[in-house]
Amino acid sequence: MKLTYRNRIGSLENTFSSFTASLRIKPQTLRYFNWNQYIYLEPNVWTFYQENKPVSRLLVSCRVPEDGSEYVQQVDLLTPMTWEKCEAWSHTKVGRRGDRYKEMKERMAEECITLAERFIPGLHNMVAERYTSTPLTYRDYTLTPTGSAYGLRKDFNNPITTMLSPRTPIP
């Protein structure tokens, strides 16, 4: 790959990643719902990531029960998360990120569950186990540079800059 093409790709901005809290639900405590629920505390969709506030937007989604029952076994909570919130641990490896990283994930999970309780009252008491992932998790398992959820950020004002041809000359 030509160096100029590689530099161009490297200079393009990626989209946000997300923080995910996957919750294993206690048996027969939450009935299955066949839709995603979006929760927004504030309408500022363009600048929210610049603020250092608790989680204020959330996607609540549940899997179809594998056992065919009417009760949920897992609920996933997703909220946008920028790379900058994890950058302090970018040099670390999976499972070796330290207590501050674990504390940050626990705090984020608590904020997500608390916000989700607006839609599912009593969710805290329904959780048997929880697992979390951050942009670092996505980076390490999917090899996206900053754990990006949707790849390169597109610019409708200048679409040509983010258009990458699938055919490039091989030197």
Question: What do these predicted regions represent?
Answer:
Residues 1-70:
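Mid-domain catalytic core of redox enzymes
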Residues 1-2, 9-12, 18-30, 76-81, ...:
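C-terminal structured subdomain/cap of oxidoreductase catalytic cores
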Residues 24, 70-111:
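Conserved FAD/dinucleotide-binding core of flavoprotein oxidoreductases
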Residues 28-29, 70, 97-136:
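Flavin-binding catalytic cores
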Residues 35-37, 73, 90-92, 128-129:
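Composition- and surface-driven signal marking solvent-exposed, interaction-prone regions
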Residues 39-44, 94-102, 146-149:
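Short, low-complexity, polar/charged sequence segments that are solvent-exposed and flexible
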Residues 49, 53-54, 63, 67, ...:
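Flavin (FAD/FMN)-binding glycine-rich loop and adjacent Rossmann-like elements that form
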Residues 118-171:
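A glycine-rich dinucleotide-binding beta-alpha-beta segment and adjacent secondary-structure elements
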